[in-house]
C-alpha cells in the first residue's frame, strides 16, 4: 500500500462529539394533568453536540473541540439551573423540542453540526439530525 493510499484511507469523513451536562427543571404542559411529567420536576440532562466533516490533513481533526465548547457555553448558560418552560421557544420543553432548540441555537456557529443528542435520564433520550 502506498503512502498516498494510506492517507486517502485515514482522511475521510468522520463525526466527532463533545459531551455536556446541564441541570434544569421543567414540566410538560401538553400532557394530561394526571401524567407525572405534568408536574414540576428536574433532570440531569446529558447533551451531545456532534459535528461531521472531512478530517483536515494538516490538523488531523474534523474541528477543534474547543470551538464546540465555545459555541455551547452561551446556550448552556441559558439552560443550566433554569426552569426550561421560561426559556423563549421552550414553552413545551420535551427532549425532542430541547434537541431542536439547541440545534437552532448552535447551527449558525457550527456549520458542520450533524446531530444533537439529549438524554434526560439514563434510559431515555432523543437525537435530532436537523431539518430535512
Predicted regions and their residues:
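Charge-rich, low-complexity N-terminal segments
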Residues: 2-132
